[in-house]
Amino acid sequence: MNINLTLIGQSIAFAIFVWFCVKYVWPPITAAMEARQKKIADGLSAADRASLDLELAQEKATKELQKAKEEAAALIDQANKRAAQIVEASKEDARKEGEKLIEQARAEIQQERVQARDALRAEVATLAVAGAEKILETSVDAKAHSEMLEKLAAEL
């Protein structure tokens, strides 16, 4: 066996093997690698988009939370103001009612005072008439007259 012929035969076999690999084996492998590479690139871009979306969502949530806090603070402030107004209105109503009751009591006292004065006048007039009758019935004795006046004064 000649070594040169062996080398040429092996070279031809190797060339056929390379051609076979390039023609039939290499295209599916490169296609699979390209598909895998595309899939990885798509996954990375989706991860980047998701990361960006997450940041945007977090910013939006932070803004919404801040807005909700501000609205809650405004509502609490408004409720406190309304409560203060209600308390002030209640105080004013109570003060007016108290003044009204005081005025009614004063009017009642004045009315009772007038009635008592009228009753006292009537009683004094009755006593004066009774005293005058007793004085006129008895003799015009100075001693008896002074005793009657003392009794009349005691009754008043």
UniProtKB/Swiss-Prot annotation:
Which SUPFAM superfamilies does the annotation name? F1F0 ATP synthase subunit B, membrane domain (SSF81573)
Indicate the principal place this protein occupies in or around the cell. membrane
Question: In terms of domain of life, where is this protein from?
Answer: Bacteria
In its keyword annotation, does this UniProt entry include Ribonucleoprotein?
A: no
Q: Which Pfam families match?
A: ATP-synt_B
Which keywords has UniProt assigned to this entry?
ATP synthesis, Cell inner membrane, Cell membrane, CF(0), Hydrogen ion transport, Ion transport, Membrane, Transmembrane, Transmembrane helix, Transport
Bilayer-crossing residues are 12-32
State where the protein is found. Answer: Cell inner membrane
For molecular function, the Gene Ontology terms on record are: proton-transporting ATP synthase activity, rotational mechanism; proton-transporting ATPase activity, rotational mechanism
Q: Does the keyword Ion transport apply?
A: yes
What do we know about how this protein assembles, alone or with others? F-type ATPases have 2 components, F(1) - the catalytic core - and F(0) - the membrane proton channel. F(1) has five subunits: alpha(3), beta(3), gamma(1), delta(1), epsilon(1). F(0) has three main subunits: a(1), b(2) and c(10-14). The alpha and beta chains form an alternating ring which encloses part of the gamma chain. F(1) is attached to F(0) by a central stalk formed by the gamma and epsilon chains, while a peripheral stalk is formed by the delta and b chains.
Entry-linked PANTHER family: ATP SYNTHASE SUBUNIT B, ATP SYNTHASE SUBUNIT B', CHLOROPLASTIC
Family, similarity comment:
Belongs to the ATPase B chain family.
Protein name per the record:
ATP synthase subunit b
